[in-house]
Design a protein with these regions (language model features):
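Sec-dependent N-terminal signal peptides
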Residues: 3-16
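Beta-barrel outer-membrane channel/assembly domains of diderm bacteria
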Residues: 19-108, 114-117, 129-149, 166, ...
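Exposed, low-structure sequence patches enriched in small/polar residues
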Residues: 52-54, 188, 197, 225-637
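Conserved radical SAM core fold
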Residues: 109-111, 154, 202, 439
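Periplasmic-side early beta-strands and strand-to-turn transitions of outer-membrane beta-barrels
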Residues: 111-113, 117, 153-156, 160-161
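Flexible, glycine/proline-enriched loop segments at strand-loop-helix junctions
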Residues: 120-122, 162-172, 181, 220-223
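Alpha-helical scaffold segments
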Residues: 203-206, 255-257
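Generic multipass alpha-helical transmembrane bundles of integral membrane proteins
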Residues: 205-209, 221-223
């Protein structure tokens, strides 16, 4: 704290002394929350105390060509991620017409980020920034050279499951990154190109078992294994009068050291790892915007890993996975609607090919329309086969074309339609926003087993099981501007989910390839319904007050929530005594007050639902808080 005071005083005096060319700004965010966290394990109704304290201070100052940015954090603990007390981020930058140098904590990307994308999202405890130096030189008007070198030490969270605390970062990585980018602007009129190479020398956590020097298998919590990758690539960008074109292609070569010492499952089975692995990625987009129409087409094709399910599912940390600094475009819509945010598409950056098309149409000054379509799948699928010749293992199946997606459930297909209607009704000064989305996706697992039967010659037993989620969501938002200067916003959202479980068991005659008999052929569908409502009254730059209501027809863990009156908050007690059935219902009240034009005080009391929270395709489970009291203060000066 003493250091912070001295730094703030120094920067303030600096800004006074050199007011003609100096600048200084700061932003403070302080959060406190307390409540209870319910267990997410099936059949467990335990509630544990949940408290978080997060305080961050961003300071930016500069003089002439020099600037400095720092971030202080005092969290013990934060809502998600590790504790931190003191200086967390620091970056110094000097820039001229021909040279710029940044040292410290670095953010930025090459191209669209397929090989290098340095960014941070504290809400999901994601940090792929580098601590090092970024040098940019411009020898002439067209050529730019970027040299980047530093260390990345971001962390990852395990998928939610038994024994996993979602608030704690499970693994941290230690990677040394060296990168070079050569870009040429207007090599031809309106045409720019870039060539790059990114080298990552990392120590990655391995979670499982390992063989010691005596040949015995011993359990370890986490072992760091060295990997090294090199990713060369290029991009081309063209700007037309009313259209843009962009194409980026790269490849990755990965080497895993000491593969023979790795043991990955508790059974007596070795999982073989190739010492070297090669993959590639590509992204293209076309934008067309003639007048009131905007059209964007995107294509992604990421194929870095085709590991079989033992490696994909039994190892929470696959050694062959992408480095955190590699984060290309998602090419699907990331929604702002509350319920749709809880059921996102979980993208596989290592094996996914797909498209996205979006149309924006400004029909008039009062009417604006959006239409979006996205579809994708993996390149590879697997069958678990057991042949009478002795082979027992995984059989890989590829799509008909590595350049296009498939509808076959084996390849985990995803499909979504989305439409949005925005209209301003002038006589009532009413803004209307209507949304609709329909999506379908294979979730959890796809299993296909083929057994050759020794007791029934020339026949196989084939078993198929998959789980598919179908979602239909209708969000609506109405905002009414009142004569008094107040604004009244009503938001509600309905979502219907069909959770489908397919079971299929047949016997096939190999000589004719025909099915002899069908033992089981059924799809078990479990329907769910969700509802979210929020009402808010506000006066711009003064205050706001609101009420939220959340409902689920069923809980996938099997245990209904909010059924015990002994656990009621005072708000829930009032509602229950008024005759409201509180089963699987959550309520909250919220308010905000502008203490000054730049300082906002927010308070919430009630229950906050947890779930997957995603940013740029990276998803982390953030737990909810029941009977919560949270306070947030935000100030800029």
């Amino acid at each position: 704290v003493f250091y912070l005071k001295r730094l703030s005083l120094f920067l303030f005096l600096l800004s006074l002394s050199y007011s003609q060319s100096a600048y200084f700004s700061a932003g403070l965010t302080a959060r406190y929350g307390s409540g209870f966290q319910s267990s997410i394990e099936i059949g467990d109704t335990t509630r544990n105390s949940y408290v978080f304290r997060e305080h961050t201070l961003d300071i930016t100052a500069g003089y002439g060509n020099f600037s400095i940015w720092s971030n202080f954090e005092f969290s013990s603990p934060p809502r998600i991620g590790p504790d931190h007390l003191g200086l967390r981020k620091l970056r110094m930058m000097w820039e001229s017409d021909y040279l710029s140098v940044s040292a410290g904590d670095l953010y930025g990307q090459f191209g669209r980020g397929l090989a290098l994308n340095l960014w941070e999202s504290q809400g999901i405890d994601w940090d792929s920034s580098l601590r090092g130096i970024w040098l940019t030189t411009r020898p002439n008007e067209k050529l730019t050279v970027d040299i980047v070198s530093g260390n990345s030490a971001g962390g990852r969270h395990l998928p939610i499951g038994p024994g996993v605390d979602p608030r704690i970062r499970d693994f941290s990585e230690d990677a040394t990154v060296s990168a070079l980018l050569l870009s040429v602007d207007n090599i031809l009129p309106n045409l720019s190109i870039g060539l790059y190479g990114v080298d990552v020398d990392a120590f990655k956590p391995w979670f499982g078992k390992m063989q010691n020097l005596f040949g015995d298998v011993e359990t370890v919590d986490s072992v760091n294994v060295r990997t090294r990758s090199f990713s060369p690539g290029f991009f081309v960008e063209y700007f037309g009068r009313d259209y843009d074109l962009y194409v980026e292609v790269m490849k990755r070569s990965l080497e895993i050291f000491d593969t023979d010492s790795l043991y990955s499952t508790p059974s007596f089975e070795w999982i073989y790892y190739e010492r070297e692995n090669k993959g590639w990625g590509g992204y293209a987009s076309v934008s067309y915007y003639p007048g009131k129409l905007g059209l964007t087409l995107e294509y992604k094709n990421y194929f870095f890993d085709d590991s079989h399910p033992d490696i994909r599912t039994k190892l929470p940390y696959r050694l062959g996975r992408l480095a955190p600094i590699m984060n290309g475009p998602t090419a699907f819509k990331e929604h702002s609607a509350v319920l749709m945010r809880r059921t996102p598409h979980i993208m596989d950056f290592e094996d996914e090919v797909g498209i996205q098309a979006e149309v924006n149409l400004n029909v008039s000054d009062d009417l604006f329309l959006i239409f979006n379509y996205a579809q994708s799948s993996r390149h590879t699928g697997f069958r678990d086969v057991n042949y009478i010749d002795g082979y027992d293992g995984w059989e890989k199946v590829e799509t008909e074309s590595l350049l296009w997606f498939s509808d076959n459930e084996m390849f985990y297909p995803f499909k979504e339609f989305y439409g949005e209607f925005n209209y301003h009704y002038s006589p009532l000064n009413l803004d209307i926003r209507l949304m609709a989305a329909r999506s379908s996706e294979i979730v959890e697992s796809y299993v296909e087993i083929i057994n050759e039967l020794s007791y029934w010659e020339n026949h196989t037993q084939e078993q198929l099981d998959w789980k598919k989620r179908d979602l239909y969501t209708l969000p609506t938002e109405l905002t009414l501007s009142l004569p008094s200067g107040h604004g009244l916003t009503l938001y509600w959202e309905h979502q219907w989910e069909d959770y489908n479980d397919r079971n299929y068991l047949v016997y096939r005659d190999l000589s004719s390839s025909e099915i002899d008999s069908v033992t089981t052929d059924e799809i078990l569908t479990v329907p769910y319904y969700y509802r979210y409502v929020a009402l808010n009254l506000s006066k711009p730059s003064r205050y706001s007050a609101g009420f939220v209501y959340d409902f689920a027809s069923g809980i996938k863990t099997g245990s209904p929530q909010n059924t015990d009156p002994a656990n009621d908050s005072w708000l829930e007690e009032i509602l229950r005594n008024s005759g409201v059935d509180m089963t699987n219902k959550w309520f909250g009240v919220q308010g905000s007050l502008y203490l000054t034009p730049a300082t906002i005080f927010n308070v919430f009391y009630g229950s906050l639902q947890g779930g997957l929270k995603c940013d740029s395709g990276v998803c982390v489970y953030v737990p909810g808080i029941e009977d919560a009291f949270t306070v947030t203060i935000t100030s800029n000066f």
